Swiss-Prot record:
SUBUNIT field: Homodimer. The RNAP catalytic core consists of 2 alpha, 1 beta, 1 beta' and 1 omega subunit. When a sigma factor is associated with the core the holoenzyme is formed, which can initiate transcription.
Taxonomic lineage of the native organism: Bacteria, Bacillati, Mycoplasmatota, Mollicutes, Acholeplasmatales
NCBIfam families referenced in this protein's UniProt entry, alphabetically: PRK05182.2-5, rpoA
Protein name: DNA-directed RNA polymerase subunit alpha
Region (Alpha N-terminal domain (alpha-NTD)): 1-229
Length: 330
């Protein structure tokens, strides 16, 4: 079968990243691939990334969650709800990771996530997160079990980790470290897509780490499908260089630029039908075109920048070569 050539993204721009969020621009993509790639990444980011969470809790003197503890401000159910919101990050990459954390305190005291005794390799991202408050002379001893997992796991499924011990309360666990994902697709020159994806995490990992992990998960799944056939149709991915991207833009007709009627008519009356013909003009020559004012000229410059073509820099380069060619002719 004849080789099929697809454009492969050569540019991924990371903007506005902080410890809990990041925005990424991926381009160029074949027409329609912005939605295809964006939707696949979003689904995996929200459902399939591994994380660490509390799976059960044991509080000294407590046998079940529907009770109160003398000298403790919150009831057991509220304490459990507060525990679910603690964000953990661990260095251990093994799937069977398990760690027990203890919190031993005496009142009066306000307990937060930082009140836990942490072993090496375990970090709490939100140490100021509130758990409960103890009154005078109250002793409080709590043990929680940390496990790794994916997505959401209900308390019923977490009971296996409690080993049927009396007083061990299984709780719901939200393992996924990604809080929100949104994306948008813009159409660019050359009938290409530009994908912008924004990721917010709980702080357990950076947005770029989440994006890379999601992409890796997708690749691993697709590789299994590729292996179904020993002789798949060969698909060649072509990574366009910036020079090639410029060349593809230069071949476009001005009708494809989605210009205002006034600007379009001005260029047409001047006999300018393609982007290649347009960039051969100097800025002064463009401004002097009939019925084309500075507002239209600014629109033209903005349009070039919008589609990733540095109009001024490229124009100077073209003019320089044109001058050199004229000198050679004379």
């Amino acid at each position: 079968m004849k080789n099929i050539k697809f454009i492969k993204p050569f540019f991924v721009e990371e903007i506005d990243e902080n410890p809990i969020s990041g925005k990424f621009i991926i381009k160029p993509l074949e027409r329609g691939y912005g939605i295809t790639v964006g939707n696949a990444l979003r689904r995996v980011l929200l459902s399939s990334l591994p994380g660490t969470a509390i799976v059960n809790v044991k509080i000294q003197g407590v046998e079940q969650e529907f009770t109160t503890i003398p000298g403790v401000y919150e009831d057991v159910m509220t304490i459990i709800l507060n525990l679910k919101k603690i964000v953990f990050a661990v260095d251990d990459e093994s799937d069977d990771f398990e760690e027990k954390l203890e919190l031993i305190a005496k009142g009066p005291q306000r307990l937060t996530a930082s009140s836990f005794e942490l072993p090496a390799g375990v970090k709490i991202i939100n140490p100021d997160h509130y758990i409960t408050t103890l009154s005078d002379d109250v002793c409080f001893h709590m043990t929680v079990t940390l496990k790794k997992g994916i997505g959401y796991v209900g308390a019923k499924d977490n009971k296996v980790h409690g080993e049927n011990q009396v007083g061990v309360i299984a709780i719901d666990s939200l393992f996924t470290p990604v809080v929100n994902v949104s994306y948008q697709v813009e159409k660019k020159l050359g009938n290409k897509d530009e994908l912008t994806i924004e990721i917010t995490t709980n702080g357990a990992l950076l947005a770029k780490e989440a994006l890379a992990t999601a992409a890796s998960i997708l690749v691993d799944h697709f590789n299994v499908l590729v292996e179904l056939s020993q002789k798949p149709a060969h698909v060649e991915f072509v990574s366009e260089s910036k020079k090639e991207a410029h060349n593809s833009v230069l071949d476009l007709e001005i009708e494809q630029l989605d210009l205002s009627v006034r600007l379009f008519n001005s260029l047409k009356r001047a006999g300018i039908d393609t982007v290649a013909a347009l960039v051969k003009l100097s800025e002064k020559e463009v401004v002097k075109l009939k019925s084309l004012g500075r507002k239209s000229f600014q629109e033209l410059k903005d349009k070039f920048l919008e589609y990733g073509l540095e109009f001024n820099d490229y124009l100077k380069e073209v003019l320089h070569h044109s001058v050199e060619e004229d000198k050679d002719k004379h």
